[in-house]
Amino acid sequence: MDDELRERVKQEAEKHALFNALKHDSDPDVGAIMGPLMGENPDFRPHGDEVPGVVGQVVGKVGGLDTEARRERLAELDQALVDELDADDEADDHTLPDLPNVEDYETVRLRAAPNPNGPWHLGHARMPSVIGTYTDRYDGEFVIRFDDTDPETKRPDISAYDAILEDIEYLGFEPDEVYRASDRIETYYDHARELIEMGEAYTCDLPAEEFSELKREGTPSPNRDKDPETVLEEFEAMVDGDYESGEMVLRVKTDIEHKNPALRDWVAFRMIDTPHPREEAADYRCWPMLDFQSGVDDHLVGITHIIRGIDLQDSAKRQQFLYDYFGWEYPEVLHWGHVQIDAYDIKISTSTIKELIDAGELDGWDDPRAPTLQSVRRRGIHGEAIVDSMIGLGMSTTDVDLAMSSIYANNRDIVDDEANRYFLVRDGQEIPVVGDAKPEAGHPPLHPNHEDRGDREIPVDDAVLVEPDDIPADGERIWLKGYGCVRYENDAFVATGDDISVVRDGDVGVIHWAPADDTVSVTMRTPDGDVTGAAEPAFADTAVDEIVQFERIGFVRVDEHGEEGSVVYYAHP
């Protein structure tokens, strides 16, 4: 990298660092700046191995400025960015559209209907976030119904029932009612019997492949014209468990020549030999399909509005046949696209995560590498931050992308004011500190915006620990934050006695550090793996569950303090 390009990198990095720091009211982070910097400046990319070092120096300088100085400097570099910070961003806020026809209902009732086959991943948070927001808006009611009527292919996990309710509470909502579909099997049987007596359902023993062929041709099953008495008798045999899996189903009569083959005489009940894991439901062998169970429940429980994926449009069309037969009015329906979430190497799928846990590749549902709500909660991310990001996606019927950086930015706004600051040095290199101007201790503030919280006292005897990438070139100065200015000479830091003006003038970068002879051993668990380091002694006084910021690294949640050191979970920059 030549000198001209290096200066351009410095200038662009400084703009990004200042903008980032002012926007989030926190110290800038190299990682948060590198992405947009390289994206906007393709000519920097061939020098990707050198750019981080330059950016690190710039970030250090910006970290040493107060808010007013940062703003003044950004105005000098790019007034448009200051104007952007000042602009009213309300027009950019995504708000949920009003629900249709709410005036037609005495009480708005919405439901989330999770399959309890495991704790929730991040994508699951969208439904309770939106439903909870709508019920708050309309003073409505939030219903949870566990759709747990498939004990074989989507086998429920007993622990998941409570885990999902805890996830909903974490997001900030409390359901008004909770149901388990497996408790309501007799209700579904009763409605099946009514349907049979109407002549609108029939038992069918055709192999699935044979029926599919007839369905494609628009040809009815030879079982379709059975009299209701025979159908009811065979259905009762299904209920009694007299058939084996795959031997008999109950079908709803629709239009066998319907233009959409998926709607032709769909299955309402089937036989499953695998017992349900819940003791209360373990004896059942005749199980309703989701479209039947859900359709009946939505009416009986009084759901007024249903939100479901765009890929489930056929469900409403199937269920409409039931509603017509029973004389019911179908709820209002809104469809949306799927959510794609970045920043994870793991497929965001409950079954995939479960397989990785069973294989020992993940430590559990709260492993920081797992894209689950339990994981981000343990990392110190507030449920409110997730809800705000999910609401920001709106209700588009197209697939939408959710950047984890959005959740991180929301969480930063929540925790930044409360999070005290500490130093953590990774891969620390010990460097002697010498010179007559050497202070006895450093006194960095607990929080840059709260002088009333006071300082941390960090005694320095003979040496400090710094990260290898922060060691300046021989003869250059660096500011040890809260301690003072030193010059790197002959593998040592020589205290210079310079005041903070050398940082404000842009001549000297700022780095964090730790005393070499008094530190706390820390293991930081991150989505990219575990990182170890040495924290300043005051970190030992933090409380478990406290959110703190390791300066120039990011926010973490304190998980435990022990004799062998402390464990924290990394939240975000």
Language-model features, listed with the residues they occupy:
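Conserved structured core elements
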Residues: L122-A125, I158, D162, S182-Y189, ...
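Extended, domain-scale alpha-helical bundle/helix-rich regions
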Residues: D27-G35, V51, G364-H450
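Active-site cores that bind ATP or allylic diphosphates and position pyrophosphate for catalysis
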Residues: M198-I353, T372, N411, D416-N420, ...
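C-terminal accessory/binding modules appended to enzymatic or scaffolding proteins
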Residues: F19, Y105, P439-P573
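N-terminal Rossmann-like or analogous alpha/beta NTP/dinucleotide-binding catalytic cores
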Residues: D2-G31, G35-N223, D311-G327, E332-V333, ...
